[in-house]
């Protein structure tokens, strides 16, 4: 929201699966409420809509869900009055973009999906000890993932679990660099502090570092090179899109379309830019 090169068209509050420990009950409404709070803090209320996503998950790979967010994605993708590239940044499930594709398949070559989620690819990375096969964001709506991977030709940039887990920010950095940066910095630091408390209540320990795993959504869209725009400072490969199984694992598919899978991310640029923008905002300079 603080990136001057980006024209934010909408923010969509999405669901959490039933039974998810983070689910507050009316999950979509709470997501919209949380987003509106951030939008208000950055002084952008009314500049773009904050919309509700679907209230539920896909039951099969052919039937779309309905929501204001889904319809907005379709309308935005089908615009013919702009040459700007359109990115759909997904930091949770793939529910909205999956249903948008089912309702209007022509959006596939008119946007790029940047998704934080999915299991490690066996040929690229090992799975962390104790990590479940069913990665958290995919677990929110596995069928949506199957729609995008197995039944669409959507242009997909994937940041799988091994990659987003590397976006570590220490508690000391949180307290000394983020928390002092005005109302917004204090709010973000407090929200991350709540995670540590919640983990402790479950008998665990959050340790000294937390993965700010959704941050690559900014890195890979707003922070591209000025010439021949691309994500030059982060490593990625093109991979034949595997078949996504119901258990969250992949089955190789040599005939799959090419998808971009990210590995090593430019944390220096990503977190340096985050702190710099929060400093500018706190000083009233953006």
Language-model-derived ranges and their functions:
Residues 36-39, 116-117, 141-143, 184-188:
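Short, surface-exposed, polar/charged, turn-prone segments marking secondary-structure boundaries
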Residues 1-10, 136-139, 155-286:
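Conformational coupling and interaction surfaces
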Residues 35-40, 100-102, 144-146, 204-205:
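Intrinsically disordered, low-complexity boundary segments flanking structured domains
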Residues 24-81, 241, 245-246, 250-269, ...:
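Metal-dependent C-N hydrolase catalytic cores
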Residues 1-29, 55, 59-172:
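Active-site histidine-anchored catalytic micro-motif
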Residues 47, 110, 215:
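A residue-level signal for beta-strand positions that form part of recognition/binding surfaces
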Residues 50, 148, 218:
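A residue-level signal for conserved active-site and pocket-lining positions in enzyme catalytic cores
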């Amino acid at each position: 929201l603080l990136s001057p090169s980006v024209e934010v068209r909408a923010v969509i509050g999405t669901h959490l699966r039933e039974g998810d420990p983070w689910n507050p009950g009316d999950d979509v409404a709470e997501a919209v409420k949380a987003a509106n709070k951030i939008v208000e803090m950055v002084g952008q209320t009314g500049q773009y809509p904050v919309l509700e996503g679907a209230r539920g998950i896909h039951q099969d790979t052919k039937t779309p869900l309905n929501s204001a967010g889904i319809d907005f994605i379709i309308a935005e993708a089908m615009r013919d009055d702009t040459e700007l590239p359109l990115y759909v940044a997904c930091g949770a499930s793939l529910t909205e973009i999956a249903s948008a594709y089912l309702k209007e398949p022509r959006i596939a070559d008119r946007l790029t999906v940047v998704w934080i989620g999915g299991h490690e690819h066996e040929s690229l990375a090992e799975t962390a000890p104790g990590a479940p096969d069913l990665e958290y964001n995919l677990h929110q709506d596995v069928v949506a993932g199957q729609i995008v991977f197995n039944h669409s030709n959507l242009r997909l940039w994937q940041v799988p679990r091994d990659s987003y887990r590397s976006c570590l920010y220490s508690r000391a950095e949180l307290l000394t660099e983020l928390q002092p940066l005005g109302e917004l910095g204090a709010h973000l630091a407090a929200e991350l502090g709540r995670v540590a408390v919640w983990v402790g209540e479950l008998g665990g320990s959050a340790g000294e570092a937390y993965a700010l795993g959704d941050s690559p959504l900014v890195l890979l869209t707003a922070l591209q090179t000025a010439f021949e725009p691309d994500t030059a400072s982060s490593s990625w490969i093109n991979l034949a899109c595997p078949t996504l199984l119901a258990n969250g694992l992949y089955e190789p598919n040599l005939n799959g379309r090419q998808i971009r899978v990210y590995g090593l991310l430019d944390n220096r640029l990503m977190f340096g830019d985050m702190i710099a923008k929060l400093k500018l905002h706190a000083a009233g300079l953006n």
